[in-house]
Amino acid sequence: MNRVKSREYLLQLAYQMEITSETALETFNSFMENEDISKDDLDLAYIKSGLLGIEENKEKLDSLIESQLVKWKLNRISKVNLSILRISTYEILFAEDVPGKVSINEAIELCKKYSDNKSVSFINGVLDKVYKNMQ
């Protein structure tokens, strides 16, 4: 199974949840019904648990993210960057099989691919603070 590819799909689905207001289960089931996407290499359990975990802990994740922002409000962060922050913060807090530093590095890679270069240092800074506060 390819965790990097699975994390990319998790980002896309977390973003979809954010813009459509679908539940995690609706979003995941819609993804599973899409026959155009090969799921052979994906860690579907990781994707599903990530979506459900983000939905279940959204207030806690957002509160933790917002507490690390300097001169920013959560509603100013792009939906893509917010989705990246939520995924990584969720992993730092709850995913025992993903070391925090690995999650931060993967978030930076997602940011480079799906956002802009200016956001990389922002994402890195916020997640580094989240990680250090969890130690």
From Swiss-Prot:
Coiled coil, from the record: none
Keyword Signal: no
This protein's record includes keyword Iron-sulfur: no
Gene Ontology, cellular component aspect: cytosol
UniProt KW keywords: RNA-binding, Transcription, Transcription antitermination, Transcription regulation
Any GO BP: DNA-templated transcription termination
InterPro entries: NusB-like_sf, NusB_fam, NusB_RsmB_TIM44
GO MF entries: RNA binding
NCBIfam families, alphabetized: nusB
Function as written in the Swiss-Prot or TrEMBL entry: Involved in transcription antitermination. Required for transcription of ribosomal RNA (rRNA) genes. Binds specifically to the boxA antiterminator sequence of the ribosomal RNA (rrn) operons.
Similarity comment: family membership: Belongs to the NusB family.
Protein name stated in the entry: Transcription antitermination protein NusB
Organism annotation: Clostridium perfringens (strain 13 / Type A)
